[in-house]
């Protein structure tokens, strides 16, 4: 199931750097993290759903690349983001 518009707007409001910000790295990573967590729950119930598993891996790779970009360009923003999202990195 895709992320609802209300939930996405809630995440955007929480992680936006300024009003109208929908494309910053923080917002993209936060939305991807929600989607990854949601897909993880689905995969736990439906272990043989390989198409969803592949989509999950693509989202994880996209988030990894965005986090690497943020870490390379602004370490402080990177640390704040991983702490607020509760990521293990």
Curated annotation (Swiss-Prot):
Q: Which UniProt keywords apply?
A: Ribonucleoprotein, Ribosomal protein, RNA-binding, rRNA-binding
Can you cite an annotated GO cellular component? cytosolic small ribosomal subunit
Asked if the keyword Nucleotide-binding belongs to this entry, the reply reads: no
What are this entry's molecular-function GO terms?
rRNA binding; structural constituent of ribosome
Matches recorded under InterPro entries: Ribosomal_uS15, Ribosomal_uS15_bac-type, uS15_NS1_RNA-bd_sf
Among the GO biological process terms of this entry, one is:
translation
Q: Kindly give the Pfam families that the UniProt entry links to this protein.
A: Ribosomal_S15 (PF00312)
Family designation: Belongs to the universal ribosomal protein uS15 family.
The free-text function statement in the UniProt record for this protein reads:
One of the primary rRNA binding proteins, it binds directly to 16S rRNA where it helps nucleate assembly of the platform of the 30S subunit by binding and bridging several RNA helices of the 16S rRNA. Forms an intersubunit bridge (bridge B4) with the 23S rRNA of the 50S subunit in the ribosome.
Give the PANTHER family listed for this entry: RIBOSOMAL PROTEIN S15, BACTERIAL AND ORGANELLAR, SMALL RIBOSOMAL SUBUNIT PROTEIN US15M
Oligomer and partners: Part of the 30S ribosomal subunit. Forms a bridge to the 50S subunit in the 70S ribosome, contacting the 23S rRNA.
The protein, known as:
Small ribosomal subunit protein uS15
Organism per entry: Streptococcus pneumoniae serotype 2 (strain D39 / NCTC 7466)
């Amino acid at each position: 199931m895709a992320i609802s518009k209300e939930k996405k707007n809630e995440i955007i409001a929480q992680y936006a750097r300024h009003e109208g910000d929908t494309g910053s790295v923080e917002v993209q990573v936060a939305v991807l993290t929600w989607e990854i967590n949601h897909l993880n729950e689905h995969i736990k119930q439906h272990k043989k759903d390989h198409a969803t598993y592949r989509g999950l891996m693509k989202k994880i790779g996209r988030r990894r690349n965005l986090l690497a970009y943020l870490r390379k360009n602004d370490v402080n923003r990177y640390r704040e983001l991983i702490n607020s999202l509760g990521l293990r990195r």
